[in-house]
Amino acid sequence: MSSRPKAFFINGGAGRVICAVPALEKYAEEHPDEKFLIVCEGGTDFFKGHPKLHNRVYDNWHKNLFHDKLVDMDLVTPEPYRVWEYFNQKCSLSQAFDIEINNKGVRDLGRPTLKLTQDEITNGKVGVKDVIAKTGKAKTIVFQPFGRGVQMKGDVVTDPSGRSFELGNVISIINKLQKEFSVIVMTELPLNFQTLGCKEQVATPSNLPIRQWAGIIKNVDMILTCDSVSQHIAYALNKPAVSVLGSTFPVNVSYPTCENIRVLDMGEGARIYSPIRITADEYADMNNDGIMAMNEKIENVIVDAVHELYNNCVKQ
């Protein structure tokens, strides 16, 4: 076995990065004397301020990183999607990272540490209060309806990955939620929700850094999300969440055993596992296409789940 320290290369979207944190925390605990590093190919946002990992983290464009550090290290690129336990629905994304990084099998992991600054928390609080002042509704919810694979073609919103809500359902659910909630929609798409059919004003903050979104999520009562980053932020911050899943399996991408996260599985019995980062599978993708489309009855199930979780986990 090599005595060289390791450099772990972490890539992918923000949700995937958050899911890597518990495994790296474990590695730090179990290798206290190793001067390992973490190289972030997708940004360092969710390592900033971390009490154990902050000083080990580098952007991959850091000046002279290779010649000053990496040339004397073993370079490791964990790929959780290629872990047997993951693609056979035996573990979560965080646990798959742990298997890749620590090789200890499937084990319980703690929540990832997400350290926000007082400025980020305060900005989130001020933003949420401003929304409440405009809507007159004290209950607050962040709604992230679209996953990373969403596309906008003209005025049509699609998601070939089968992770996102359908736009028509988004409008209907917002209208139902706005009867009691101030709704803050987390999306990068340039959508005018009033023009699309929302009866009341919808808060849609634009061009916010992802850590500022974390500050907002910390200050709302709860979130409603698809398979996307906000559910991982909510889990890290112990914030109640309703997670609606389609093409992806709850055990892989969400937290079905967490008491303040309610998982609603649109794809149960219908989805086929899509082996992303392993191979292309046209049949799986075609099968999962449109799997998140829902009728009004299902919309009502989602809205009822929001109210139930609010009453059980937020309202005191």
Descriptions of predicted regions:
Residues N55-N60, T204-S206, I261-G267:
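Short acidic-hydrophobic, aromatic-tinged amphipathic segments that line or gate anion-handling sites
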Residues E34, G42-G43, K48-V157, T248-N252, ...:
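Conserved nucleotide-diphosphate donor binding/catalytic pocket of glycan-assembly enzymes
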Residues P5-A7, T140, M222:
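Structural motif
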Residues V156-V251:
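Donor-binding and catalytic core of enzymes assembling or modifying cell-surface/extracellular glycoconjugates
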Residues L37, V57, K69-T77, I184, ...:
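Hydrophobic/aromatic beta-strand patches that form the interior of the parallel beta-sheet core
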Residues F9-V21, G149-F165:
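A short, glycine/small-residue-rich beta-strand->loop->alpha-helix junction that serves as a flexible
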Residues V83-D130, T257-Q316:
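Leloir-type glycosyltransferase catalytic cores
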Residues M1-P51:
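N-terminal pre-catalytic "stem/leader" segment of glycosyltransferase-like enzymes
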